[in-house]
Regions:
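Histidine-dependent nucleotide/RNA phosphoesterase domain, centered on the 2H-phosphoesterase fold
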Residues: 2-221
Length: 221
């Protein structure tokens, strides 16, 4: 879960006991994202409940507080590289910004028999979001993080399909996603880029914000 930090960013995490930052063999699972305001998170949780109530078998649900807009996935990174990554992001996202988006349609990746992900799309200033993602890509590419081959798609992941899900479960969930009519969903204002850490646990991944950019970003943006 993202912590709410006072101004004066980038923020530093409270690392789990026995896992302090520093050089050595320890690695962090990192990604770059835009976090969502509370109203959007609550609306997405309601969409998850609508799907769950309709017998969406085979899905592994993202914790509502962990739903975010991914700009760049970095993977397992040595902890000693953390400060260099923060400096690169600080250069890429220097100026304050405000992007207005709306929660849009329900969709999926993978087709009816290979369904992998269920998501809600974003509408509004998505072209500006794509430019923001491209700035992040350019900043991190010289550090050995290759650019994404696929074009940027502004979406918020609600669920991932379990590896052992049957073709029937995938088809049922695919049909549900196609047929479900969503109620009107709220908009959101995005004002910060966050460097996030993902920790895999038995109940699913937990996310923690390590730093936000630009440095003047409000906490929890």
């Amino acid at each position: 879960m993202t912590r709410h930090e006072p101004p004066g960013l980038p923020v530093r995490p409270a690392y789990p006991a026995g896992r302090p930052p520093g050089p050595g063999g320890r690695s962090l699972r990192l990604f770059v994202a835009c976090e969502l305001p509370g109203e959007a998170t609550e609306a997405l949780a309601a969409v998850q409940r609508l799907l769950q109530e309709r017998d969406a078998e085979g899905a592994r649900w993202v914790r509502p507080e962990g739903i975010h807009l991914t700009l760049k996935f970095l993977g397992e990174v040595p902890a000693r590289r953390l400060e260099a990554i923060e400096r690169a992001l600080a250069r890429a996202v220097r100026e304050p910004f405000r992007l207005s988006v709306r929660l849009g349609r329900l969709g999926s990746f993978g087709g009816s028999t290979g369904l992998r992900v269920v998501w809600v799309g974003l509408e509004g200033e998505v072209e500006a979001l794509a430019h923001l993602a491209a700035r992040v890509e350019r900043a991190l590419e010289p550090m050995g993080f290759p650019r994404e081959r696929r074009p940027f798609a502004a979406h918020l992941t609600l669920a991932r399909v379990k590896e052992g899900a049957s073709p029937q479960d995938r088809r049922r969930l695919f049909d549900l996603v196609r047929s479900l009519e969503l109620p009107p969903l709220p908009g959101a204002t995005l004002e910060a880029v966050s460097l996030m850490q993902s920790t895999l646990e038995a109940g699913g991944a937990r996310y923690q914000c390590l730093a936000r950019f630009p440095k003047s970003s409000p906490a929890g943006a």
